[in-house]
Amino acid sequence: MLDLTQHNELVITQQVEHLEAFVGFETANRYNIMTEEGQHLLYAFEESGTISRQFLGSHRPLSIHVVEDGTRHVFTAQRNFFWFMSHLHIRDDSDKHIGSLQRKIKFLGRRFDLEGPDGQLLAEVRGRLLRPHTFMIHKPGGEEVARVTKKWSGLLREVFTDADTFRLQFHKDLDQDFRMLVLATAFAIDMDFFENNNKRGGFGFG
């Protein structure tokens, strides 16, 4: 399996189908994960129902599968349908539960809790009100250990598609499991905060 500890910066780019871009029909999310230099490392794809994508929007139940070389499984992030606060569970290639991501209520910003397999708090993901595209990941003691930033994709790409690009930065001492949790965090941020339900269909829950 790819050793994520060898990469302290990654870029995630979303792939958008022409049907979704021009008609607004919600298709399953797909992402390329690469180095800052553009070297392809991993591929991620959503598994969900067509009807739930159209009518439940960003609240739909789904799984995100991350694979290497097209077939080798790296990890899966899974969540059930939710009304208010999403809860994403992450399992590695051996189906071991390595942690979860729980969205929390925050009135002046955005927040997730990163939890270990036993529910212990590993880190807080904080998005400030005045910096809506930057999410900082802090250990309980306050040290920032990772960051997820939504990058500007260009005017036409931003206006006519929902395609997003994210930059991930890791502290050099983070282990493999924690880096997988940060990758899953980027997917959750995209689905919870940057999916355009008005264009993508759905009842506009979130």
Where are the regions that the model predicts?
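Low-complexity or membrane-interfacial segments used for flexible interactions
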Residues: 1-63, 72, 79-86, 93-96, ...
